[in-house]
């Protein structure tokens, strides 16, 4: 969960166009703190603290960030998820636990699992346990 959150937050960072290097540094620092599970206290917030996502959203919006990206950061990927058979990617995640065949130009596919003794990898997860190798593993 933290990895996907960090990825979305880092993509939000690249989508921003800050007017000052200081603001960009604040965004990077906030994003890294959230990725590490730390509480973010935004200097922009009038309340002096609070929800991590709200602090980052406010910071990104003040610095000219992408509103769609901020919405995804706050609402999660299921708010505007992509149904099975439709184009997907990092910014357009699949619904109901299905997976995307490619991070940029993929298609939402029904999630399936591989039984013990069969080849597994990132796109072919094991039904029981973890795949020992992300590309050329065998389910144990």
Swiss-Prot record:
Disulfide bonds join 81-95, 88-100, 94-108, 113-127, 120-131, 126-139. Keywords: Disulfide bond, Ion channel impairing toxin, Knottin, Neurotoxin, Plant defense, Secreted, Signal, Toxin, Voltage-gated sodium channel impairing toxin. GO terms for cellular component: extracellular region. It is found in: Secreted. Expressed in trichomes, that are stiff epidermal hairs located on the surface of petioles and leaves. One of its GO terms (molecular function) is toxin activity. Residues 1-18 form the signal peptide. The keyword Disulfide bond applies. The keyword Signal applies. GO terms for biological process: defense response. Residues 19-78 form a propeptide. The presence of 'disulfide through disulfide knots' structurally defines this protein as a knottin. This toxin contains 2 'disulfide through disulfide knots'. Belongs to the urticatoxin-2 family. Plant defense neurotoxin that causes pain and systemic symptoms in mammals via modulation of voltage-gated sodium channels (Nav). Potent modulator of human Nav1.5/SCN5A (EC(50)=55 nM), Nav1.6/SCN8A (EC(50)=0.86 nM), and Nav1.7/SCN9A (EC(50)=208 nM), where it shifts the activation threshold to more negative potentials and delays fast inactivation. Also shifts the voltage-dependence of steady-state fast inactivation of Nav1.6/SCN8A, but not that of Nav1.5/SCN5A or Nav1.7/SCN9A. On Nav1.7/SCN9A, principally acts by binding to extracellular loops of domain IV (Nav site 3). This is Beta/delta-urticatoxin-De2a. It comes from Dendrocnide excelsa. The lineage of its organism: Eukaryota, Viridiplantae, Streptophyta, Embryophyta, Tracheophyta.
